[in-house]
Amino acid sequence: FNPKEISINTKVIPMDVLLRRLKQGTLILNPDFQRNEVWTDVRKSQLIESILLEIPLPMFYVSADEEGRWTVVDGLQRISAFRDFILGATYMKSKRSEDEGLGIKLKGLEFLKNIEGLQMKKLPNNLSNRIMEAQFSLTVINPGTPDEVKRNIFKRINTGGVPLSSQEIRNALYGGKISSLLKRMSEMKSF
């Protein structure tokens, strides 16, 4: 690729922007080079606890397309944790506002044991506000940047958290239509 074709910028966004995009479907969590969601509810809860303790989180990386959609390049596990706690699976299916906030219950917390077992909707206002007002650093890979750059960024920064398997690294490096087909096939019951 031509390095002059790379167009990247960084911004700070609040939690409500991530949530709005999740609700709209303009934040894509499962590109062909990303692995599946692998975090347990305990790990997701500990991420929420980190926000409540105001511990800075690593940067998120997204790739923007011409229609304004963002595809997650790095940060799938973290954004999925936000979705599963703040919005919840029931809301994501029903899209009914009364179902929002009934996601996973916090568990396995290290410091804030007094809120174990609570869902977003049951948190005291000061804590739910802290979550909703959290801000994140986001790197946007702008439209026109070659796909190879997206895969390379994923490979370079994905060194923390749950280690990638050899197959996940191969998908990141050599992905494309065949990886997408293989991923769909692996999810079939006949496999």
Q: Where on the chain are the PLM-derived regions?
A:
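Short connector loops/turns at beta-strand edges and beta->alpha or beta->beta junctions
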Residues: K23-Q24, P56
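Basic- and aromatic-enriched surface patches that contact anionic nucleotides/nucleic acids
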Residues: F1-V17, P31-F191
